[in-house]
Amino acid sequence: MSDIKVGVYFCTCEGELEKAIALDSLAQEASGRPGVAVVRKDPSLCSERGIGAIREDVKKLGLDRVLIAACSPSLKTKEFADLGINKYLVERVNIREQCSRSHAGNPSNATKKARAILGMSLEKIRHSKALEPVTIPAVKTALVVGGGVAGINAALDIAGTGAEVFLIEKKPFLGGKVSELHRYYPRLCPPSCGLELMFSRLESDPRIHVLTSSEIESFSGSPGNFSVSIMTSSSDAIKSPEKNQHRTIIAGAVILATGWEPFDPTPLTEYGYGRLEQVITNLDFEKRSREQKQFLDQSKKTAFIQCVGSRDERHLPYCSDVCCMVSIKQALLLKEADPDNEVYIFYNDIRTPGEYEDMYRQARTSGIKFIKGIPSEVRQDGQGKIGVSVFDTIAGERTEVAVDLVVLATGMKASRGTTELKNTIGLVTNKYNFIESHLQCHPLDSQREGMFTAGCCRAPMDVSRSIESAGAAAAKALRYLQDEITVSPDYPVVDILKCDRCKRCMEECPSKAYSFDEKGFPKVDSLKCRVCGICMGSCPLGAISLGELSIEQLSGMLDVLDKSYLGDDEPVILGFLCKNDAYRAADDAGLKGIRYPSNMISIMVPCSGAVNSMIVSEAISKGVDGVLIAGCPDSQCHYIQGSALAKTRLADVSNKLKDMYIEPERVRFASISRDEPEKFAETIKEYVEELKKLGKNPLRII
């Protein structure tokens, strides 16, 4: 460490930290460490005065590294962003939230833990490297796949920023399913009004190129420079396939708006669809009422059956979101045509969020009868009527009504276009075949950088939500519609001298950011990479490291960790905490003054899936008593599968420990959400007690 100059700075946080930690003692010890050129203590390092002092030292003393022992690295990020030195050569040491505040009742142990953390951080920073953002040329052209209302609106919004747009549609015409509708809800205006305006804007905008009868043939490239091969069918392509047109589009971003398809109720034979002509679907209703002027006057008694195929494990297990409102709208149209029309809606649950409750109230006021119960049978009664039999769960009796028309409220399912694109582009879909990412945090993303979803390819939704999602997707795409894109440099790096080309990194990368070079070695596309670190955790040879956290750094930190920093009888735990949830829960424990034992040293990782089994095994082999990996619950993982992979890998380590006659309980995984500081503290307490019962790690050398 003598070849570099390190500045070590302690913040007292206006005296708070000195109440629990002997900072003067730590500062004196730090000044004697190899490579440490200056040690300072300041009551408020994040103040202008404190920041200025660090900058002055960097300039005058020629510091190569800066270590700040203060609050959590999750805090004050802007204040410490520019210290006059490459930000990747600055190390934040959390001695407040996860040390002084969590162990304020035991200053001696808090100081010992702070000393251990400081030593590990100094070792880590020794291996830190200056990294610079990478700038990559890009194009201001977007590709929008799907010509329904979502795709059209996304194209118009993007073109409005000055970018060029290619809008491709599989069918010979634009408009999607909306072009088949009779009326929108809640205003009950005709879709033709909005569509004609959209078509006019498309036609008049020279930046938008519309390609109908077109499909994606092949797809390659990266965000900013996707290469997409498009085939456009000619009108006589059946007779002369060679007349099909082929072109390649270079696009900076892609909007996926591949729409939806209606559920086919034919398998539900109890409803007679396809057998009884008086039984139609809700989409059939739209088409007939739009095309046949007298349709709404023909039926004097009409029954709507909700959830046909939806919320049914045999067919569509999910709610399709729009069906209740569609039936209420259609029922109101019947009442508008003839107020004496008898209308029944058979339902499981009526779902009318927000202002849509007004339409539900209007429907009840107009005399539409709502009967809670799903009909068991629909049959012809011999007199030209359709008999609908249902058990009314509110009245507690079976009811049968004779009607002229039955409308089945069928749900939405993912389109064939989405399924086809899944294979062509390499999309990730959920179990229902809708395009998926992290629904809570990144609902418009597709798990593929530079590709965003709009409309019903993501989930069932109505027209207004589809248009809303299109605008949001267009806004997110703008980042990639630039002359050049700047990429964070902390993406993973592969050491090809260690790599045996096993392909594990490629298989487990949730962003599909890996490909292989001409020699078969993995290479990462920095534009596709989300820097989750799952590839680093996957490599059985430890050949992959992140720019900001390397295998070498982690191994070095283990070497300098005092395995008995609290005393010979106290277990030492090494904790790997995911930065999005578990680490923040640990910080919150400190902020709330929640006490827990000082036996754990935590290392923040981008995802629990970034922890390599080699490091876990190395920690145990070097005498650490226990290793805890804490990450998001599976359903909340920001990188979809990181937590699940971490648990699988940890199970493998446990089995190896058994073979070594070492207790497998020395490694464990904990699911801890961002808002569970109490659970975090309780987890540490329980683990410390369990390790005390197990006794000292037999590999610990005193």
Residue ranges and their predicted role:
Residues 1-574, 578, 583-585, 589, ...:
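Residues forming the flavin
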Residues 664-702:
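Divalent-metal-activated hydrolytic enzyme cores
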